[in-house]
Amino acid sequence: MDSMPEPASRCLLLLPLLLLLLLLLPAPELGPSQAGAEENDWVRLPSKCEVCKYVAVELKSAFEETGKTKEVIGTGYGILDQKASGVKYTKSDLRLIEVTETICKRLLDYSLHKERTGSNRFAKGMSETFETLHNLVHKGVKVVMDIPYELWNETSAEVADLKKQCDVLVEEFEEVIEDWYRNHQEEDLTEFLCANHVLKGKDTSCLAEQWSGKKGDTAALGGKKSKKKSSRAKAAGGRSSSSKQRKELGGLEGDPSPEEDEGIQKASPLTHSPPDEL
């Protein structure tokens, strides 16, 4: 037999050494983009569109809550001890300052609803996932998760970042919010602040996203439950007022008075005498 060519024999001898070197080499580290992609699979921080959307939502709510008062703020003393004209609180600088200083703290009342898509993942109330897990724990089921039970109700990283970005946004666009408050309240705040200024020339698709709600969703049905309670209270109040009117008109209509009712109730029943003996 012919012997194996010299170059081929050398390759066979070097092959085990190459395999050994490959095994000893350290694993390649993930680049920033790859690491960020893996992190985003679990934590997806809010976009600027989502931040502005919920800042506008809470600003609307806060201005609506503070706009129901008729309080007048005094501006000081007038000339020659005359009473100075006051300013309505609803048009005052004080109202604007109080709302903008506390607006970002309101975002900490939100929770992350991972079962929802888009910007609807941010909403008040407990998410369906954690509500189900809490119900299982209360029923005695042992639930094993990477997050300890004590931290289930803690603020998520996404909501904390939502509040952080809110602080920056309100400070950066303070003059825009003030301009809307003084001159453009007839315009929609979301359109004025977000579409026309904060997100001008950028993606505004999240502003049109609305959550329709699902059956049994406590976060979506909170308002409906309160309406039902209020209607029941009104009905109960109507019944009590009508019964009160009937009592007041009882004497005119010839209804028995309470004393007469008491006498009728306390009247002893007729007794039967034993039969006569023959």
Swiss-Prot record:
Domain of life assignment: Eukaryota
Composition bias, Low complexity: 233-243
Signal sequence annotation: 1-30
One GO process term, biological-process aspect: innate immune response
Coiled-coil annotated residue ranges, if any: 153-179
GO molecular function, one term: signaling receptor binding
Glycosylation sites: 153
UniProt-annotated location(s): Endoplasmic reticulum
Predominant location: endoplasmic reticulum
Chain positions covered by the region annotation Disordered: 215-278
Parts of the chain that traverse the membrane: none
Keyword hit for Transcription regulation: no
Keywords in alphabetical order: Chaperone, Coiled coil, Disease variant, Disulfide bond, Endoplasmic reticulum, Epilepsy, Glycoprotein, Immunity, Innate immunity, Signal
Keyword Coiled coil attributed: yes
Span of domain Saposin B-type: 47-271
Cellular component annotations (GO), alphabetically ordered: endoplasmic reticulum lumen
InterPro entries in the cross-refs: DUF3456
Record note on quaternary structure: Interacts with HSP90B1; this interaction is disrupted in the presence of ATP. Interacts with TLR1, TLR2, TLR4 and TLR9. Strongest interaction with TLR4.
Disease in which the protein is involved: Developmental and epileptic encephalopathy 60: A form of epileptic encephalopathy, a heterogeneous group of severe early-onset epilepsies characterized by refractory seizures, neurodevelopmental impairment, and poor prognosis. Development is normal prior to seizure onset, after which cognitive and motor delays become apparent. DEE60 is an autosomal recessive condition characterized by onset of seizures in the first months of life.
Function (record text): Toll-like receptor (TLR)-specific co-chaperone for HSP90B1. Required for proper TLR folding, except that of TLR3, and hence controls TLR exit from the endoplasmic reticulum. Consequently, required for both innate and adaptive immune responses.
Homology family: Belongs to the canopy family.
Protein name: Protein canopy homolog 3
Organism: Homo sapiens
